[in-house]
Amino acid sequence: MRIRALLALVVCMLACAGCTKKKSTDELVQDLKAKDDKSRLIAVRLLPQHKGDAAKAVPALIEALKDTESDVRISAAVGLGYFGDEAKDAIPALQAAQKDHDARVREAAGVALTRIDPARFPARSKGRPSGRK
C-alpha cells in the first residue's frame, strides 16, 4: 500500500513538473488571442512580469484594452501602468479606455495614465471632485 501511495505521489509530481514553467512573453502574447476568457485573463495578468520585454508586451496589452471581457480590459490597463514610461505608446488607447462602459476599466485606465506620465496626468484626489476647492 505504501508503494502505491509513493508511486501515485511520484506520478503527480512528474505531471505537475511543467505546471510552474514560466511562459515566455511570446507565449503570453499568443495566449491573448485564445478563444477562452480564462486564458486571456491569465496572460494579461502575467505579461507585466516581463518588464524587460516591453517592446512585445506593451503592444499586446494595448490590443487587450479592446477585449470583449471587462476583466481582461481592466488587467490590461493595470499592466500598462506597471510598465510606466515604457508604455507611453499606450496613452491614446488608455485615453479611449477612459470612455469604456465599465467604470472599473475607466478607473484602471486613469491610474495607468498617471503611472505612465504623472506630469501630464496627475493623480486625482478621491476626496473631492475635480475643479472644486
Label every model-predicted segment.
Residues 35-36, 68-69, 101-102:
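Short inter-helical turns and helix N-cap capping residues of alpha-solenoid HEAT/ARM repeat scaffolds
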Residues 20-30, 52-65, 85-97, 119-128:
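Amphipathic alpha-helical scaffolding segments comprising HEAT/armadillo-like alpha-solenoid repeats
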Residues 19-21, 38-53, 71-86, 106-119:
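Structural detector for internal amphipathic alpha-helices that build alpha-solenoid repeat scaffolds
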Residues 25-36, 45:
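Immediate post-signal-peptide N-terminus of mature secreted/exported proteins
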Residues 131-133:
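Short, solvent-exposed mixed-charge patches
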Residues 1-17:
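Sec-dependent bacterial lipoprotein signal peptides
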Residues 11-12, 59, 92, 112:
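N-terminal non-cleavable signal-anchor helices
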